[in-house]
Every structure is written in structure tokens, then in C-alpha cells.
Curated annotation (Swiss-Prot):
Its main location: secreted. The lineage of its organism: Eukaryota, Fungi, Dikarya, Ascomycota, Pezizomycotina. GO terms for cellular component: extracellular region. It catalyses: Hydrolysis of terminal, non-reducing beta-D-glucosyl residues with release of beta-D-glucose. It comes from Aspergillus clavatus (strain ATCC 1007 / CBS 513.65 / DSM 816 / NCTC 3887 / NRRL 1 / QM 1276 / 107). Glycans are attached at N57, N197, N493. It is found in: Secreted. This is Probable beta-glucosidase I. InterPro entries: Cellulose_deg_GH3, Fn3-like, Glyco_hydro_3_AS, Glyco_hydro_3_C, Glyco_hydro_3_C_sf, Glyco_hydro_3_N, Glyco_hydro_3_N_sf, Glycoside_hydrolase_SF. Its EC number is 3.2.1.21. Belongs to the glycosyl hydrolase 3 family. It is an enzyme of class 3 (hydrolase). GO terms for biological process: cellulose catabolic process. Beta-glucosidases are one of a number of cellulolytic enzymes involved in the degradation of cellulosic biomass. Catalyzes the last step releasing glucose from the inhibitory cellobiose. GO terms for molecular function: beta-glucosidase activity.
């Protein structure tokens, strides 16, 4: 790659070449113009790891903790380090552009992609995202802020019209992007799928051009979300530079015709192409060649950072009687559905095939010096656990054979085209390719051998984007080939799981065959669904066992145990792109299991893994509770580090945890109704609502305990004289002394809140405006400084003037952290002023 003289290159490009540069060629690559030595660029998801170019059977990758986990760290320096490692992973995958971070706002706990964003508050989200992007771009990799903007639900996400006031848009939903851009002008921005007040974002000139480009002075590349372009000239004229993925639906000959008919002027097309060429120049120093090979890193130092991030994200919610940390020398009973399952990431574009994963049970076992025992307690899968890892090939290797044909099994003379050995019986074939498979229509037989460890009735399940039949020793057990029912798997492209059962004997080996037909063989009605590739399959199995039997056994064992830890929560089955959750509850049986184990042993520790809030009807019973999110590769080790005190918990909640779903401010206005969703809570999202109506959540935003204690003292404020025009350069500097008053080294998060004076508009009781994290040894004191621009600390969006308003009056400053201690001060705004820009 070479640096381009952008203006000279624009003059040399033909109309056809310009048009080609404004759309991708496939799922992950931009167009090349060999005549002018313009190469193709590669991009990759994304939110918590760099998958590379393949969903199916691709190169493994590092999996970082999910974004709500990283949000819980409140650690801007850590996020910078995470960004740098993400960049190195990107380079190893030959990718110039990372499709992340996601910084939408979780207006409801039910949002399917809520785990992908950092926080419900724009200041926390924006400052973390800005540092993450700096880490990426300091290494030369292009960051992509997404999804711009109000992409806050999965229900009808391509079509839903988000009806939102401009005040809420500015103060809540644009704020993470606003603050991230102040720290790091990212190379790319990705538009949201949805409409805003009647117009799809990808063709919304007010959002893309007026606010992002003109008001904020940003000059990067705007790309669509995948299949989120809905027009030709409208999108080009609004400022959408790049349609993704390819092949194009809306550019190509349609765009050439639009230019020739002056629906889109060529100088406007030149603006779009100019941004594409500027992106080439931004990533050129990376030296990544076209179609670079994809490699794995998995270095010891990377594993250490992932472990640190996982541990630093764990929130200590309760710790009565100092139940934690656990004693390594004592025996321990581990209970629960998440104990031996590494819930390391959410689903959808955030999912990837990790280098390795550490389940919580394995993390505990590695730490404990005493006996470690296990009880299932309850199963919490949404679909039956994947069977692939329990299968063996005919040669005795782990997994199963995947054999591909162009004809169905009814053709005895069909030719075998491809044969792979797979271990995961969850396969998304979006990017499967073979020279002799020339269309989306093909067939595959999956064959492996299963030897159960226990007698019993086993349930088998098959989910397909396509058709599927599962046979045991030649007997048809599951038929998912006709009368299919629409499900949510594979981005909404697949069926529900169809099940069958068979009695099996322990120690006997059974031949398992799944006959699969790709997506064109399905009879599902796919209207209104974005079809991703030629198909997908998932087959699983489990021995049938009653929940009562499992719960009773767990409770009995708990009553006799020295130490007990319960691991429960959600997985990527429950929290995933493509659909929202129906409720906040844990999977069926989990709450009863936790409650009964706590009755049997009140000192049992509860660890919840979820990307977003869940209900906890047993919370009053538990003395010790951790919120552990989806912790990436090292989730099990990170949790164990905190449980045993090798890491002192320092995380704070980035989301409010309501007592029940009905308490959430979006409860009456979540999901699309007749094609629209009303953001009826306006600016009162998350803690802003709970504090305004004086409704206590189960655990508030910013909550988190420690194994040590801290004091905060000596708050002082420094301001500068006001200027006639409000702009950057009027900092408010708060300094506070923080002391570790306990016996354990630890970290404190100092939070700075602003309380506005009474004005002519309703405003939140207080708003977070700054924070800092400080690490202290026992007895150590440090001075912490938090600097906030006065315009950002005081302003609200005035819809009449269409400007930010900083009103005259006395503003209170509150400084909080671990514990109930609040330091107070104030400052004056001498005159009301209005402003625009970053």
C-alpha cells in the first residue's frame, strides 16, 4: 500500500471506479482499483474480539470481557491497553478496520445487544470508548464507533422508527459518541439500522452531515451496518460513504444512473470517495497486504491482560460478615449451571471462537488447596447443549465428520466434495466456500459416535437455517425438515429447536448422523429477515433429569459443605444480537435453586454471569454476591482471583439493576408497536429516572464494594474566569484526597456528580460528569484530580434555540465512591450562555 494524493486520484478515477469504491465486495472487504494501485481493505468484528473473516471454522481469537464488563472497571487506562491489544489482534487477522466499539445506551435491560455497550451513562461510556479507540488507533488500526444512533433494541431493528426528542437525543443517546470524539476522532462511524423520527439513519442528513460532520468537525468514513442501506441517492446525499456488505444492492449501476440523472451530483459522489481514499491513507502505515493470512497470537502477556480485565470487571455487590474472600485451604462445593460452562461472550456479531476458555469451576479448582466438589443444581440452557465435543470420529478423534455434497442423501451416486473434522456442532455457514459448491444450495452429512456415561432417556435437538434430520443408529429421532417454525438463531434466520428422544445405555456407542440441507431447502417465510449466507446448523443433546432431583441434591450437599459458591446467570443463548429478552428473569429453575441452597447454607456465595441486569428475588437472603458479566477467555480465572482475594474487587456497576422489570423507565415503551418505538422516558434513562422519582433500584448505578475501606477528604474546586463565548478552556478542576484505610491493597473509583440549580426545565437530580480510578496500598493516600469543562458540566439541550444552554446559577458538586461518604462543594455560572460543537 502507498499513500495517495487524494485529489489527484479522484481526478484519475472513472465514474464506474468511483461507484465501485462506495460499496463492499463481500462481507469484509472494500473494492480495489488495480489500475490505480488502490487495494482492498479488510474489516472485522468487533465488539469483544477480532474474529477475522470467517464465522465458520475460522482462526481462533482472543475474547475480551464484554463491554458492560469493561464498563464496570471504570478504568480508562485499562481500556486504552485493551484497545492496543485489540489492534494487535486485528493486525494478526490482516484487518485494517475494527467494527467497534458499540456505544449505544441501554434504555432497557431487555435489549439483546445491551452487553455490547459500556454503560447507561454517556460520560462513563464516552470516556471509556474514547480511550479504547485511542489504543486502537495509536497502533494504526481504524476504530468504528457504532451504531450511530438509537440502535437500542433488536425487535424490528431494520424497520423500527425511534421517536425521540432532540433533547434526549443530545443529552443521552449522542453523548457517548460526542465525548468519545473529543478524545479520539475515530477513522470510521457505522450508522444504525433504525429510523429516527421518520428517516433511516443511513439516509439521515441531519444526523450524518449536520451533526457528525459539520457540528462536530469530523472527517472520517461513514459506513452502513450490514444490509442497513435502504436507498441510493438519498443515502449518498445524506453522507453515507460506504455500503456494507457487498455485493452492492444500492450502488453499482443504480448509483451510476443516479449520478447521470443528477439525483446525486458527481461532486457529492466525490465527497464519498474522498473519505474512502482518506481511510486508505489512515491505515496505510500498517503495511497489511491485500488478502493477508489470518494468524493467532495467544501470547502469555495477552492472557495476563485478559485475566486482569476479567478480574477488574467483577462487581462485589454484597459481602455481609466478610464472607469473602474464601479460604483456599478449606474444601469447597461448586454449584450451578454456569460453573462448568464458560459464559465468555454474548451472541451474534460479538461471538467468536476463542483461543481457549476457562470455566468458573476450573478457575476455582486451580486456586483451591482443599477438595473441590460439584453439583449441577439446575440446567439453564435455552437449547440443548451442543453435542459435538462429546462425539468421536470413526478414527477416534474428538468431534465429527462434516461431508459436503451438491445432492441430497436420496441420491446414491452423489459426489463427495469436501470433508472436514469439526468439534463444535454449532456452525454458521455464512462464509463457507468450496470450488465445487457454486450456489447457496448444497447438502452436508455430519457423522460422529456418542458413548453416554449414564443410562437414561436422552433428548436430542436440531436447529437449522435450512433443513435437518438427526438419526441414532439409523433411527430418525428428530425431523426438522418440514412444517418448520421460525426461531431466533443465526440472526433470526433459523428454525426453533425441534426435539426428539431416545433411551440410551451407559458405555454403549451410538452412531449419530445429521443430514443437513442449506438455506434454500427451508420452507420458512424469510420476508423481513436479513438472510446471512447459505445456512447454519446446531445439534445438541442432554440426559433427561428432573430439576427437583438436581435442586434437592445441591441443597443437601450445601448444608454439609464448608464453603459453597453458586454460579448462575445467562449465556450467549439468552443474550444475543437478533432478538431481545422477553423478561429479566434467570432461566427456569435457577431462582428456586439459588433460594433453596441459601436456605440450606446461608453463607453460600452467589456469582451471576450476565451482560445486563437480571432479577434476584433471593438477593435479601445472600450474604455475598458477585456480578461477573461475560468475562472473555479468562472469565473463570478472573472470577476465582476475586473469590479468593488474589484480586481485590474494584468494579462499579455501569447499569442500574432494578428490582423488577416494571421499575425500568422504558417498561411501557420498549419494542416496536406498529413500526415505531416511543422513547417516552425522554432524558430519564437509568439512574436519572430512579433518582428523579425516588424509586430505589435493587443495586444502583455506580455501586460496588471492596475488601478494603477508603476515605475521601479535602475536596477543593478550581475554576477560571468566564469568557464571553462558552467554549473549551473553562475547566473545573476538582481535587480530593483518597486514603486506603483498610488492610488490603485496592482501587477506588472517585465519582464526580453535578447537581443543577432550579431552572425553567426539568433536569435530573444529579448527573455523572467525571471519574477517576486510583490504586492504593494499605494506609496510602493520593490526591486525585478530575477535570471537567464547564460547558459539559452544566449544559442541557435547548430545543427552541437548537443549542446547548449553560444557565446562570449555583451548581453543586458531589464526590462519591465506595461507601456512603459524600463530599460537597459548589461553583457559579455567572451568566447564561449557549453553544454548539464538540
Amino acid at each position: 500500500m502507498v499513500q495517495f494524493d487524494v485529489e489527484k486520484t479522484l481526478e484519475e478515477l472513472t465514474l464506474g471506479e468511483k461507484v465501485a469504491l462506495t460499496a463492499g465486495t463481500d462481507f469484509w472487504h472494500t473494492a480495489a482499483v488495480p489500475r490505480l494501485n488502490i487495494p482492498s481493505l479488510r474489516m472485522s468484528d468487533g465488539p469483544n474480539g477480532v474474529r477475522g473473516t470467517r464465522f465458520f471454522n475460522g482462526t481462533r481469537a482472543a475474547c475480551f470481557p464484554c463491554s458492560t464488563a469493561l464498563g464496570a472497571t471504570w478504568d480508562t487506562e485499562l481500556l486504552y491497553e485493551v484497545g492496543r491489544l485489540m489492534a494487535e489482534e486485528s493486525i494478526a487477522k490482516g484487518s485494517h478496520i475494527i467494527l467497534g466499539p458499540t456505544i449505544n445506551t441501554q434504555r432497557s435491560p431487555l435489549g439483546g445487544r445491551g452487553f455490547e455497550s459500556f454503560a447507561e451513562d454517556g460520560v462513563l461510556s464516552g470516556l471509556l470508548a474514547g480511550n479504547y479507540c485511542k489504543g486502537l488507533q495509536d497502533k494504526g488500526v481504524a476504530a468504528t464507533l457504532k451504531h450511530f444512533v438509537c440502535n437500542d433494541q433488536e425487535h424490528e431493528r431494520l424497520a423500527v422508527d425511534s421517536i425521540v426528542t432532540m433533547r434526549a437525543m443530545r443529552e443521552i443517546y449522542l453523548m457517548p459518541f460526542h465525548l468519545a470524539m473529543r478524545l479520539c476522532k475515530t477513522a470510521c462511524v457505522m450508522t444504525a439500522y433504525n429510523k429516527i423520527n421518520g428517516t433511516h439513519v443511513s439516509e439521515n442528513k441531519q444526523i450524518i452531515t449536520d451533526i457528525l460532520r459539520k457540528e462536530w468537525g469530523w472527517d472520517g468514513l461513514v459506513m452502513s451496518d450490514w444490509f442497513g442501506t435502504y436507498s441510493t441517492s438519498d443515502a449518498i446525499n445524506a453522507g453515507l460513504d460506504l455500503e456494507m456488505p457487498g455485493p452492492t444492492r444500492w450502488r453499482g449501476t443504480a448509483l451510476a444512473h443516479a449520478v447521470s440523472s443528477n439525483k446525486a451530483f458527481e461532486y457529492v459522489l466525490d465527497e464519498r470517495v474522498r473519505n474512502v481514499l482518506n481511510l486508505h491513507n489512515f491505515v496505510e502505515p500498517l503495511g497489511i497486504p491485500e488478502n493477508a493470512p489470518e494468524e493467532a497470537l495467544n501470547r502469555p502477556e495477552d492472557q495476563a491482560l485478559l485475566r486482569r480485565a476479567a478480574a477488574e470487571s467483577v462487581v462485589l455487590m454484597k459481602n455481609e460478615d466478610n464472607i469473602l474472600p474464601l479460604k483456599k485451604e478449606k474444601s469447597i462445593l461448586v454449584i450451578g449451571p454456569n460453573a462448568k460452562t464458560a459464559a465468555y461472550c454474548g451472541g451474534g456479531s460479538a461471538s467468536l471462537d476463542a483461543y481457549y476458555t476457562v470455566a468458573p469451576f476450573d478457575g476455582v479448582k486451580a486456586k483451591s488447596e482443599g477438595e473441590v466438589s460439584f453439583s449441577q443444581g439446575v440446567y439453564s440452557y435455552n437449547e440443548l447443549p451442543v453435542l459435538g465435543p462429546l462425539l468421536k470420529t470413526e478414527e477416534g478423534e474428538k468431534g465429527f465428520k462434516f461431508r459436503v455434497y451438491n445432492e441430497p442423501s436420496s441420491n446414491p451416486n452423489r459426489e463427495l466434495l469436501d470433508e472436514l473434522r469439526l468439534e463444535n456442532s454449532l456452525g454458521f455457514l455464512m462464509d463457507y466456500k468450496h470450488p465445487k459448491v457454486t450456489s447457496f444450495l448444497f447438502y452436508a452429512d455430519m457423522e460422529g459416535y456418542f458413548t453416554p456415561e449414564e443410562d437414561g432417556i436422552y433428548d436430542f435437538g436440531v436447529t437449522v437455517q435450512g433443513t435437518g434430520k438427526l438419526y441414532i443408529d439409523g433411527e430418525l429421532v428428530v425431523d426438522n425438515s418440514k412444517n418448520q417454525r421460525q426461531g431466533t438463531a443465526f440472526f433470526g434466520n433459523a428454525t426453533v429447536e425441534e426435539k426428539g428422544s431416545k433411551e440410551l445405555k451407559a458405555g454403549q456407542t451410538y452412531k449419530v448422523v445429521v443430514e443437513f440441507g442449506s438455506a434454500p431447502t427451508s420452507d420458512l417465510d424469510m420476508r423481513g429477515v436479513v438472510v446471512f449466507g447459505p445456512g447454519g446448523f446446531r445439534f445438541g443433546a442432554a440426559r433427561r433429569v428432573g430439576q427437583e432431583e438436581l435442586i434437592s441434591k445441591a441443597a443437601e450437599l450445601a448444608s454439609q459443605a464448608d464453603q459453597v459458591v453458586i454460579f448462575a446467570g445467562l449465556t450467549s443463548e439468552w443474550e444475543t444480537e437478533g432478538h431481545d429478552r422477553d423478561h429479566m428473569d434467570l432461566p427456569a429453575g435457577s431462582d428456586e435453586m439459588i433460594s433453596r441452597v441459601l436456605d440450606a447454607n446461608p453463607n453460600a456465595v452467589v456469582v451471576i454471569q450476565s451482560g445486563t441486569p437480571v432479577t434476584m428475588p433471593w438477593a435479601h437472603k445472600t450474604k455475598a454476591l458477585l456480578q461477573a458479566w461475560f468475562g472473555g477467555n479468562e472469565c473463570g480465572n478472573g472470577i476465582a482471583d476475586v473469590l479468593y482475594g488474589d484480586v481485590n474487587p474494584s468494579a462499579k456497576l455501569p447499569l442500574s439493576f432494578p428490582v423488577r422489570l416494571q421499575d425500568n423507565p422504558s417498561y411501557l415503551n420498549f419494542r416496536s408497536e406498529r413500526g415505531r418505538v416511543l422513547y417516552g422516558e425522554d432524558v430519564y434513562v437509568g439512574y436519572r429516572y430512579y433518582e428523579k422519582v425516588d424509586l430505589a433500584p435493587l443495586f444502583p448505578f455506580g455501586h460496588g464494594l471492596s475488601y478494603t475501606t477508603f476515605s475521601r477528604s479535602d475536596l477543593s474546586l478550581a475554576t477560571v474566569p468566564e469568557k464571553r463565548q462558552l467554549e473549551d478552556g473553562e475547566p473545573i478542576t476538582a481535587t480530593v484526597t483518597v486514603t486506603n484505610t483498610g488492610d488490603v491493597a485496592g482501587a477506588e473509583v472517585v465519582q464526580l456528580w453535578i447537581v443543577p440549580p432550579p431552572t425553567g426545565v426539568n433536569r435530573p437530580v444529579r448527573e455523572l460528569k467525571g471519574f477517576a480510578k486510583v490504586f492504593l496500598n494499605p494506609g496510602e493516600s493520593k490526591t486525585v484530580e478530575i477535570v471537567v469543562e464547564k460547558k459539559l458540566a452544566t449544559s442541557w439541550w435547548d430545543e427552541q434555540r437548537e443549542k446547548w444552554a449553560s444557565e446562570k446559577g449555583t451548581y453543586k458538586v458531589l464526590v462519591t465512591g465506595t461507601g456512603d461518604e459524600v463530599l460537597k462543594s459548589s461553583f457559579e455560572v455567572e451568566k447564561t450562555r449557549f453553544w454548539l460543537g464538540l
